[in-house]
């Protein structure tokens, strides 16, 4: 009787086994919101400045990886991403959470670029993330951005409207550290590279499925950015780096 009961229990447990992986229960957005209310903070705020949250990022990363690919909604704001913000300035490649880093910001754009005003609005209804993957729709440019990464590489996939030109803004003067020196150049038809020096040099080497036409330095009276312009020969295919 005991053996029969045990078999019934084991059969029941096996039948209830979930097909989900443990990573299916992970929400990368947890901890990305800033704490404002006294009951959350544990004290009453006496100034209007932004307070602290968990300072984590929702982007794509593997454990102990050299690359963490994540959106920046505001520079010099902990991890660079704050859930309550409404714009994205770029997707950066280094992020340990809490503070600093956020190197090599890239943002897919179309049309004429204004260096001091190129960020895009986004909506959380059109944003998603799970371990190793991040996606968001950039409303200003009509671009769907998808990001993932390996231990040492980042992978970008940008789906533009078929009729739009394809460009990237590389905001090389910005990171969460002060950038003292930077550089970016075309290497060959499908490759560009560069570096940022902000408390240590960070180098990158980017390979594209589209041909790189040129890299232009664009500046106004407030800011300067690099604009990578791509050849349109592939037409409707997403831009991939």
Stretches found by the model and what they are:
Residues 4-11:
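Bacterial N-terminal signal peptides
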Residues 18-241:
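Accessory carbohydrate-recognition regions in carbohydrate-active enzymes
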Residues 14-15:
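C-terminal motif of bacterial Sec signal peptides marking the signal peptidase cleavage site
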